[in-house]
Amino acid sequence: MIEESVKPLNWTPAPGIGYTVVRRPDGGMHYTFTDVSHETLVHWREFALEHLLQADRLTRNLYDLRAVKEITQEAIEYGIEVNSDPSARNIRLAVVVASDEIREAIEKIPALTAPGGVEFRIFTDINEAEAWLDRPLTLMV
């Protein structure tokens, strides 16, 4: 069996942004956010939408928001925009949070997005998030 090649990440860190991203072993992306400042959100939005333009397979992504202390309305609006992209239907997304306040804010994104977007779940334990992401992707369809 020929192993499918992993797509390049095409991400470059920039001064002043509050997130990093690395390619996951399964080909998805692992984002780690430390803040959701305007600069961070603009950079993330551009990167995320660019990747969605090239989405050609089912993907598992992990967003680690445990260091984020507050989710702004702007962050929710950007999340809704990206989650509404038609290519988002190919993504299984686990979000890891550290507080009920962050969980409640993040829950607004799928609640305000038209059906058919990302398969989305929120966790407080990163190992539980990984176990959920590891389920076969064929369960999405």
Q: Predicted segment positions?
A:
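Amphipathic, Lys/Arg-enriched alpha-helical "gate/interface" segment within cytosolic domains
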Residues: 2-141
